[in-house]
């Protein structure tokens, strides 16, 4: 039998634990004080509006719902970004964040000829599994200081500077998983400069936009 997913498998262990004072710190799902997933008011309102429109349900375009894709572009880059106005961004709706990572890595490998990738040390465990499944080798670049209390940016940027061209670099856009420690705006500018100069391919995982 296949082993349990190292992250989602914790949910099964949590549910089997009979202690009343247990706390679930596994999968990042918002729970109320009763330990239940609440129906957020914004979700309830969105569902009400969709129901009241009485629109037919049919197949979406291959790239996803156009209005959703356009909204994502504006959310990520800002509605006034020149690339948004020029219509030069390609956006594809996927089955969740894992699906986006899988599609991005597969596209890079199959159509751009990317063979190597690097992820931060530490990173979300599934990053490595997804990239390997898509045929990429996976290395690591340093991210934390020796006492694991801050980002070791000097070590990180030094490692990025010696990567071979055409390496896929997994970066965490915000709320780094699992540390929560993020780069400053100035550090991001330096990373962008190195990525451009070294001809690297950045893949930015932005699972926690707004945090």
Predicted segments with their positions:
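Conserved core of the PLP fold type I
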Residues: 49, 54-201, 210-211
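Conserved Walker B
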Residues: 206-207
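N-terminal "arm"/small-domain region of PLP-dependent enzymes with the aminotransferase-like
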Residues: 1-64, 71-74, 78
């Amino acid at each position: 039998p296949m082993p349990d997913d190292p992250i989602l498998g914790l949910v099964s262990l949590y549910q089997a634990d009979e202690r009343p004072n247990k706390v679930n710190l596994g999968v990042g799902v918002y729970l109320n004080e009763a330990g239940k997933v609440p129906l957020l008011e914004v979700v309830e309102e969105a569902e009400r509006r969709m129901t009241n429109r009485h629109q037919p349900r049919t197949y979406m375009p291959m790239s996803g719902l156009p209005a959703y894709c356009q909204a994502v572009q504006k959310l990520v880059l800002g509605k006034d970004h020149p690339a948004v106005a020029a219509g030069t961004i390609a956006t594809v709706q996927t089955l969740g964040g894992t699906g986006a990572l899988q599609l991005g890595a597969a596209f890079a490998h199959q159509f751009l000829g990317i063979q190597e990738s690097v992820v931060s040390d530490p990173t979300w465990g599934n990053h490595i599994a997804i990239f390997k499944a898509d045929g990429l080798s996976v290395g690591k670049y340093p991210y934390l200081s020796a006492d694991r209390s801050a980002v070791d940016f000097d070590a990180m940027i030094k490692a990025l500077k010696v990567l071979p061209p055409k390496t896929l670099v997994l970066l965490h856009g915000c709320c780094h998983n699992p540390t929560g420690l993020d780069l400053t705006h100035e550090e991001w500018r330096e990373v962008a400069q190195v990525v451009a100069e070294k001809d690297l391919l950045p893949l930015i995982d932005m699972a926690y936009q707004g945090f």
